[in-house]
C-alpha cells in the first residue's frame, strides 16, 4: 500500500517523471506537473515570527515535458524539459556548477539522449547528479521524499561551509539532495537494472577559457534492490569557479525497507569544502506508516554535525507529516519541523531563507498538493 499511495505520487518530485499513465506508442510526448501550496508559521526568522503563504514545499512546483521515440533494436530517443515556478507566477532560480543561478525556462532539467534496454541510457544537457538520482530517486532513502519536502532537507548553523551561491548565512541543501542544483553541460550514463544492481556516472564540462576544470563536475552512483530492501551510494564533486581550483565534495549512503504498510529509511551524507577544510555530516532516520489507503503519517530525525572549520556546530532536527489523500493525485497535509542547535549557534531550517536569532526554530504548515 505504501508503494501505491506514496511512492507513485512523491518520487516524481526529484526524478522528474510525472504521475501519468504509460503511453504505449512508437513516439510520444507527455505533459506532467506537480503543484503544492499552503500556509506556514515560522517561529523565528531574523528575530521575528512570521506567517506566510508559500508554495513548492512538500513538492516542488514543476511543469515538464517527457518525450520518447522508438528507433528500433530496443533503442529509444528520449528527452526531458522541466521548469520550476512559484504559484505567484515567477520562475524559481536554480543553482548549478556554473557561477550564479539560472532562471531560464527549463532551468530544472533539460536533456536529450538514447536509451537502450540492454546497454543503458546516455543523456546530455542539464541534469541531476547521482546524489539525487541514486539516493533520492532510485533508493528513496530520504524521508524528505515522502512528505518533509523542502523544509525536510538538510540545513543548519553551517554558513562557514562556504557553498557558493547558497543563500546568505545558510548552508542551504548542503548535500545537494533537494534537486535545486542540476549540472550544466553534463554527459551522464545510467546502466539498465542488472539483477537488482544499477550504476552510473556523469561528467559536467566546465568550459572556462584557460581553465578546463573550472565549473566542471563529476558524479557516480550505484544501487542494489532485493525484495523489500534497497541500498545505494553516491559521490559528487563540483569545482565552482569561486573556489579557485577547489571543490565541494559530497558523498552519501542510503537504505530503505518497504513493507505493505510500513516504510523505513536511513541516510548518511558528508559534505566537504576542499578550500577551507570545512566538513558537515548528516545522519537521518525516518519511518512512514500507511494507516488506511487515504491516511498516512511519517516521522524523521536528523543529526547534523561539523568539524572545527564550522565551529563544531551541530543540530538536531525533528520532522512530522500527516497526510490525507483526497484522490490518487491530490492530498492535504499537516507538517511540522523543529531544529535545535548547540549553544551559541543559530538554527536554520532549510527553506526559511533566514536563520533564527536563537538556538531553535519551528515551522508548522498546512498544505495541499496535486500531481498531473
Task: Name what the model sees in each region.
Residues 19-25:
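Sec/Tat signal peptide C-region and signal peptidase I cleavage site
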Residues 26-41, 51-206, 223-227:
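Outer membrane beta-barrel
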Residues 29-37, 73, 77-81, 122, ...:
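Transmembrane beta-strands of outer-membrane beta-barrel proteins
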Residues 42-46, 88-92, 133-136, 210-213, ...:
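Outer-membrane beta-barrel proteins
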Residues 48-51, 96-98, 174, 206-207, ...:
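Extracellular loop and loop/strand-boundary signature of outer-membrane beta-barrel proteins
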Residues 62-64, 109-111, 186-188, 219, ...:
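Membrane-embedded beta-strand positions in outer-membrane beta-barrel channels/transporters
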Residues 213, 217-325, 335-338:
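Detector for outer-membrane/organellar transmembrane beta-barrel domains
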Residues 326, 359-372:
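Outer-membrane beta-barrel "beta-signal"
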Amino acid at each position: 500500500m505504501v508503494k501505491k499511495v506514496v511512492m507513485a505520487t512523491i518520487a516524481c518530485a526529484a526524478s522528474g517523471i510525472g504521475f501519468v499513465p504509460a503511453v504505449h506508442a512508437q513516439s510520444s510526448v507527455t505533459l506532467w506537473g506537480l503543484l503544492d501550496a499552503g500556509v506556514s508559521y515560522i517561529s523565528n526568522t531574523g528575530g521575528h515570527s512570521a506567517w506566510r503563504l508559500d508554495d513548492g514545499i512538500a513538492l516542488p512546483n514543476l511543469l515538464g515535458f517527457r518525450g520518447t521515440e522508438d528507433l528500433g533494436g530496443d533503442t529509444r530517443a528520449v528527452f526531458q524539459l522541466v521548469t520550476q515556478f512559484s504559484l505567484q507566477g515567477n520562475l524559481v532560480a536554480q543553482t548549478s556548477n556554473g557561477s550564479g543561478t539560472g532562471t531560464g525556462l527549463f532551468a530544472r532539467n533539460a536533456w536529450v539522449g538514447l536509451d537502450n534496454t540492454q546497454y543503458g541510457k546516455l543523456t546530455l544537457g542539464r541534469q541531476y547528479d547521482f546524489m539525487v538520482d541514486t539516493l533520492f530517486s532510485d533508493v528513496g532513502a530520504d524521508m524528505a521524499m515522502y512528505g518533509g519536502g523542502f523544509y525536510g532537507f538538510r540545513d543548519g548553523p553551517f554558513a562557514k561551509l562556504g557553498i557558493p551561491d547558497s543563500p546568505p548565512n545558510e548552508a542551504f541543501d548542503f548535500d545537494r539532495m533537494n534537486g535545486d542544483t542540476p549540472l550544466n553541460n553534463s554527459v551522464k550514463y545510467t546502466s539498465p537494472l542488472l539483477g537488482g544492481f544499477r550504476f552510473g556516472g556523469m561528467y559536467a564540462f566546465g568550459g572556462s577559457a584557460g581553465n578546463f576544470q573550472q565549473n566542471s563536475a563529476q558524479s557516480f552512483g550505484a544501487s542494489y534492490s532485493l525484495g523489500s530492501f534497497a541500498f545505494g551510494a553516491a559521490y559528487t564533486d563540483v569545482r565552482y569557479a569561486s573556489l579557485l581550483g577547489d571543490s565541494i565534495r559530497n558523498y552519501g549512503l542510503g537504505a530503505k525497507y518497504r513493507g505493505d504498510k510500513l516504510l523505513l529509511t536511513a541516510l548518511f551524507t558528508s559534505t566537504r569544502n576542499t578550500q577551507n577544510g570545512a566538513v558537515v555530516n548528516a545522519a537521518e532516520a525516518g519511518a512512514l506508516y500507511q494507516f488506511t489507503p487515504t491516511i498516512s503519517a511519517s516521522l524523521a530525525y536528523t543529526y547534523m554535525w561539523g568539524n572545527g572549520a564550522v565551529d563544531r556546530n551541530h543540530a538536531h532536527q525533528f520532522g512530522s507529516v500527516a497526510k490525507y489523500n483526497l484522490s490518487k493525485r491530490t492530498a492535504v497535509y499537516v507538517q511540522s519541523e523543529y531544529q535545535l542547535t548547540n549553544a551559541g549557534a543559530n538554527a536554520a531550517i532549510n527553506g526559511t531563507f533566514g536563520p533564527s536569532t536563537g538556538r531553535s526554530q519551528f515551522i508548522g504548515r498546512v498544505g495541499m498538493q496535486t500531481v498531473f
